[in-house]
Amino acid sequence: MVRGMGGSSETKFVQELLLYAASAALSCLVLFAGLRHLDPNRESSKKALEHKKEIAKRLGRPLIQTNAYEDVIACDVINPDHIDVEFGSIGGLETIKQALYELVILPLRRPELFSHGKLLGPQKGVLLYGPPGTGKTMLAKAIARESGAVFINVRISNLMSKWFGDAQKLVAAVFSLAYKLQPAIIFIDEVDSFLGQRRTTDHEALTNMKTEFMALWDGFTTDQNARVMVLAATNRPSELDEAILRRLPQAFEIGMPDRRERAEILMVVLKGEKVEDNIDYDHVASLCEGYTGSDLLELCKKAAYFPIRELLDEERKGKQATGPRPLSQFDLEKVLATSRKTGIAATEYTTLNSQSSGWSRNREPDDYQVQAAIE
């Protein structure tokens, strides 16, 4: 009888032990699932894995090891082979393109030529500035394409996080990932919105992020062999923090195109399109005073609709049409009569930056290399 009671107690103990073990295992699973859903970088990590596989395949090396923060930044890595912009597809700016090739692209493509001494080496910071629509972002993409460097497009929205301390870790991930993928270009468009002048009214998180960015930037500038470059673009160079300007020793003004450059832009835009052979590009360019490269692209897009409209009108009238006619010079001139250029924005840019004592606007036409003058 006693033995039976003892066996019953032992069985009950084993059952309770198994129940507790099952409960603990279930609790761990629930906790693990909950933590996975709380991870702000979970979806970004999945997307980044595909990017890493693609980059590893192009570079011909095994998949790189990255942490969760680098996975988030990897989502903004662009394979240079997938960039459809090159110097040949950018009209005008010939002198600047030549300077960028010598100072930026060549050291990234042929590092062995710049490995002797301290005077030569990859540029660590380059600034492209000028009015809106003049092709700064296109130039940045073309640099990545021509150099074969991976293009890390840094967006401030991706660096901000609701989790304390994550912003600094994401900034650190930008540079650590660039090191692993070098040659690499870290591109910051509208850099004034991220690295503008520091003010007492700035949020503490933004200030800490700027400080972390500059500290890490200083770290790789001391490494002469690192093929990592920060490329920034802005419409407001006078708004940049002076500490940032010191880290961007090579600065290029991408100004409004002149008549010859406007004609070149028109020819590049219309290359490969169905156009009449007798278009006088120089004459059309003379009518486009104050137009940026972006304006000229929109001009051609609007003009391309005229042949389509005429074709549809013919079809509505019951007439047989073989296809839209070629785009003509008259189409371009018709659009010019009603189009709106961004010259106002360009004028605002000139006025704003001429008021800043730190930026001189009087430059020789052949002075393609513009140094940021800080007083």
Role assignments for model-derived ranges:
Residues 1-99, 107, 123, 361:
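AAA+ P-loop ATPase mechanoenzymes
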Residues 37, 146, 302, 306, ...:
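Active-site catalytic microenvironments for nucleophilic, acid-base chemistry
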Residues 21-34, 113-114, 194, 240, ...:
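Long, contiguous hydrophobic alpha-helical segments, chiefly transmembrane helices and signal peptides
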Residues 28, 32, 36, 41-45, ...:
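Short, flexible/disordered secondary-structure transition segments
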Residues 54, 68, 72-73, 283, ...:
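Exposed alpha-helical structural elements
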Residues 9, 73-291, 303:
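Walker A/P-loop NTP-binding motif of AAA+ ATPase domains
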Residues 62, 66-68, 258, 328, ...:
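Ser/Thr-centered flexible coil motifs
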Residues 2-8, 286-298, 308-375:
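C-terminal engagement/docking regions of AAA+ P-loop ATPases
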